[in-house]
């Protein structure tokens, strides 16, 4: 528990971060909720709920309240935030901190207001919203912020967002592509957790100096029985080809929409990648090669918004 009056909240699609002024990041947990199917009572939140994903009995459901950059359940968001707020500030009923909220990009005004109302109801005094793209740029300069559900692409000038776009490509799309690849190439059905582990451990946007391999366990689509196959980092390049091509096409369109003066600034200063999805091996090099613009990975890319 922390004695705090002001909090920062990065409500990410896959991970939630809370920040305390003067103390930095005090909480970083997966944005998962496990609840009873009939009563909708919450039984686990965060890392505990994530560990249950894909392994729950029929009466329990584990899901992420946010998906593809959109809020799927305001009720679950409220319950999740109540849990995390108690974890950070304690159970004092009269203590209600002020909260700076990094909003997922592309939310409709009505959706934003509903989210703000839900957060206030969860136990904060007031909410100051800011776009994730702006928050990540404050942390790392002009950047491409690749989240779990979406990618925010922003160009700033004198502190103002001049050109921006929201792309339906993110870490979840990478996971789905890996699942689809193993289904087609190896007749193996794997879960989202296994796909994420493959992405993190051997996922690649370009050739590595050393070939990596990892066993992927799932269900054979031929026999219906459990089966394991060995997957290489080179196969991951093939698996991720389609979402990466979509990402590059969208980035090309964004550059074309940028005023010439700002495009010149981008060329001179380069691009910074942030967000959890930006950690895919070789992605910075692929973007740099294809856009002909120096591209670097931010320090602690998954924490840029929180910082």
Which residues make up each language-model segment?
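Nucleotide/phosphate-binding catalytic cleft detector across ATP-hydrolyzing
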Residues: 1-146, 156-272, 278-306
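Residue-level signal for beta-strand positions within conserved beta-sheet cores that form or flank
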Residues: 149
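A structural feature that tracks compact, well-ordered secondary-structure segments
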Residues: 152-154
């Amino acid at each position: 528990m922390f004695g705090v009056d002001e909090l920062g909240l990065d409500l990410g699609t896959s991970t939630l971060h809370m920040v305390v002024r003067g103390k930095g990041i005090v909480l970083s947990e997966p944005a998962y909720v496990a609840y009873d199917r009939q009563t909708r009572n919450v039984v686990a939140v965060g890392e505990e709920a994530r560990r249950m994903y894909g392994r729950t009995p029929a009466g329990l459901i584990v899901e992420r309240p946010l998906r593809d950059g959109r809020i799927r359940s305001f009720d679950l968001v409220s319950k999740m935030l109540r849990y995390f707020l108690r974890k950070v500030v304690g159970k004092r009923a009269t203590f209600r901190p002020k909260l700076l909220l990094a909003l997922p990009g592309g939310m409709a005004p009505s959706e934003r207001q509903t989210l703000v109302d839900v957060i206030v109801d969860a136990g904060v005094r007031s909410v100051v919203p800011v776009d994730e793209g702006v928050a990540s740029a404050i942390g790392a300069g002009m950047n491409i912020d690749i989240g779990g559900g979406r990618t925010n692409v922003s160009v700033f000038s004198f502190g103002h967002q001049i050109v921006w776009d929201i792309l339906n490509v993110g870490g979840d799309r990478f996971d789905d592509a890996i699942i689809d690849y193993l289904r087609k190439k190896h007749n193996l059905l794997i879960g989202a957790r296994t796909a994420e582990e493959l992405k993190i451990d051997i996922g690649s946007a370009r050739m590595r100096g050393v070939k990596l391999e990892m066993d992927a366990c799932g269900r054979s689509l031929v026999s219906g029985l459990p089966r394991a196959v060995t997957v290489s980092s080179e196969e991951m390049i093939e698996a991720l080809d389609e979402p990466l091509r979509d990402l590059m096409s969208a980035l090309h369109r964004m550059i074309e929409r940028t005023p010439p003066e700002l495009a010149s600034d981008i060329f001179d200063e380069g691009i910074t990648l942030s967000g959890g999805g930006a950690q895919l091996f070789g992605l910075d090099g692929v973007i740099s090669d294809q856009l002909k613009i120096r591209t670097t990975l931010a320090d602690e890319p998954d924490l840029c918004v929180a910082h």
